[in-house]
Amino acid sequence: MVSLSLLIAIIVVTGLLAGFRHYGSSRCRTVPFKIKSRSIEKTASTRLLGMSLEDAMKRYPLFNFYPGQSIREILSSWERVTYGNGETIAAPGFILQGLVEIWYREHLVCVKEKGSFLNGSMELLGYSTRGTKKARGSVEVLLIDASLVRDNIWYILFSMLRKSCIEIACRYFELESKLVEKETMKIKDDGQGHLDLFLSFLNEKLLLNLDDGKEILRRDIEARLIGRGETIKDSEESMDYIMYVVSGEILVLAGESAFVFGKGSVFGYFSLFFDLYSSIKIQAREDSSVLLCSSSVLLKFGLDEKKFDHSMLLDIDESLHIIDESAEWMRLLPGDMIAQKGDASKEIFYIGAGSVKSASRESSSGTVIGGKECIFGESWNESSIATRITDVVRIPSLLVDYFLERDKSFFKKYTKRLFESGNKANGKIVSIIPVGQYKDIESFSRKLKSAIGASSLLLSRRDVVEILARRAFDTTEEVRFMDYLTKMSRRYEIILIYVENEYSRLLRYLLNFSDVLLAVGTTFADIPEYNVYCRIEFVKIYEERRASDERSVKKSKKINHGPRYLESRKESFGQYDRVHHVLFPSKTMLFCSKDFQRLARSLLGKRIGLVLGGGGARGLAHIGVIQALEEEGIPIDCVGGTSMGAFIGALYAKECNNYHVFKQAKRFSRKMSNIWILLLDLTYPICSMFSGHAFNRSLHSIFGDGLIQDLWLEYFCITTNIVSYEEEVHRNGMVWRYVRASMGLCGYLPPICDNKKLLVDGGYLNNVPADVMMGMQVEKIITVDVGTVLENDHFDYGDTLSGFTILFNKFFGNKKFVTMEEIQYRLAYISTERKMKELEANGNIIMLRPDLGKYRTMDFKKFDEIVACGYQSTKNAIAKWKQEGTYDVLFFSLKKQTPKRRYSV
């Protein structure tokens, strides 16, 4: 017996020691997690239809009213009731199995299925329901104690009322006029001053219990004089204040309704709790005086959601109760699938906050998904998933049908709002972390914030912790944090959040709310692995401006026997969707903000793309175009091109220095106009006139073995694949080889062999590839077309033509004959002309066509003339834009952000 006890004691002690060792080792060693970007084509984690209880607990914040309970505890301690077909369900609950119909009078407004709540927020607040819930077949329901909900998660319950009832009613069912009418209040003048009257009203109505704080609040109330016709608040602006009319009359326009508030009126009570007046317009009907008090001021004096008078909602409109009982608020996790391609459309999804992505579009807060499919009874034409934590409200199609039947004009109003919602811009949330040995993430973040300007908000780890009240992983606080970010995103275009530790638990938390993760470092390094659906971009820091050569291929003695095939995107960028090169801090420049401004434009979606067309020596005009753009302060964020445009574009992308472009292009032109170099490269013309060796050496001497993905600017070039008869877009690989392939004019140079492909001049299929640039998230595209041949006054030589005739005419005649290179470029332009006509209709594409009619394809010896022609043509075009007023329209977003500069830096 003693030996048995001793044995048990030894086992227990050994286990404890092992546990301590494990605990100690885990404390001393940080276990990294990897951040891995997931594409929407992959299977999403959870679908919304028919969710299990386990999945629903993670996605319905309402389940947090008894935190810490497991599924087994919930199923064992909560009451489960089975209802037969047609039975009425009176209590609130969650559907474990079956279908439940919700009827309003004689109308079926909703059918809820497994994985849904039966009740709306008003029922949980203790008010009687207006609809009737009936079981369709056998239904199993998990009943909910409403008093327990009210006691434990009041904020979540209030959020449910706001998100799935009030906000939907105002934005898509046009009930804001009912709310405006209901909240109209008047203060009776009892002889006190207007300010004292307003303070007394706020104290009593909002239950503030000011006492000693009344004098402090008095100083925070704003008095404003408003002239007749002056706008106080425009539509699409948020309203978060309550207003007292001291004198005059205030006109409130809500949809098709108009309300007039006279002396003593108070308006804006609902706006203190809900963001529902964004669509109304407020202006002075006559000269007026008003007092304003914002919600941010009242929060300091104890205003919170528990002090909202819910009874004000009871008599507004019966539609509000129907919406509350039918619509459902859910909080999706990154990767959750809203709809799968081919599914029948039964619901409309309103995105309250967050982001949802499909193959063709990305939808953010304030937009609707599935509206068209629901109205016209179509199936989903593509799958959609949440890319971060996203608030969605499920609106059943039966509810829409009810409103269509009730109001014949509803279809027109609803569809108008449905399609208008997709145009609303919302702030982007960007998390910033250091990787590798880089530590100065705070300075980087502040510099980026400065480049973006007043339209950005910068938050540190400490700021986030304060917002969360040190309860970062509580569901209620997560909902509060989401609401805070949503409110800020309506005020700011970018919210920057930086975290000093890449292995921080807070980072895991923030990634679920982020649209973009910026990894900042001096060298390419793997970042921690963790599955996320947001964009992951890398910012590589330099101390001097130079073309990156970190991943360049080692030089080969024989240029034509180097690496042959294109690197895959995975090998080139690894985990990153985009790579930015940033000079910070600069060893050679005191103030260097050009790269930060470029990064800022990328995050804001305001990038400027430059597309350079092919045209042989005429392409030298691109140098003058770039110089003119730089002098006018028009930035270039990414470059693409074909043939000669690919060459000039690569030169500029390499160092962002137009002097470097000028110098290297002139050196190249000298070689191309040197008859001896050309003669030495002649070969037996079975495949081509020249072997291409001299041409290759010229390009290699300029670009070396650098890679496209290491160029300072994002770059691409176009080639024609004569094996598959398709155009190829090259975004990575060796620069000189793909520039050479893009310049490979058939008959002159042999095709480039690339992984069983034969690549020739890209101009045959796409001479000005603006369509490719359109897919690179740019706001404006400047295209330069130098290949257009405007002159057609060639001599009619008949059916045959001798080359000796052309040669003789060159010295002793003045007739104009068509040449081989001109024929090549005219052929190339046949397929391009159709694309150019389509692009001209796009308002975001700016077309430049320098007058180069007198210059031929091989006129490299006229380098200075052609460059000057491109420069002057661009300066004239910009002067014309300014005279016509189109310059401000085209580049308005760059005015305050990008300073005018004289030199490339």
From Swiss-Prot:
The lineage of its organism: Eukaryota, Fungi, Fungi incertae sedis, Microsporidia, Unikaryonidae. Its EC number is 3.1.1.5. The gene is NTE1. A nucleoside 3',5'-cyclic phosphate 2 binds at residues 310-428. This is Lysophospholipase NTE1. It is a single-pass type I membrane protein. The chain crosses the membrane at residues 1-21. Pfam families: NTE_Ploop, Patatin. A nucleoside 3',5'-cyclic phosphate 1 binds at residues 198-319. The active site is at S643, D761. Belongs to the NTE family. Inhibited by organophosphorus esters. It comes from Encephalitozoon cuniculi (strain GB-M1) (Microsporidian parasite).
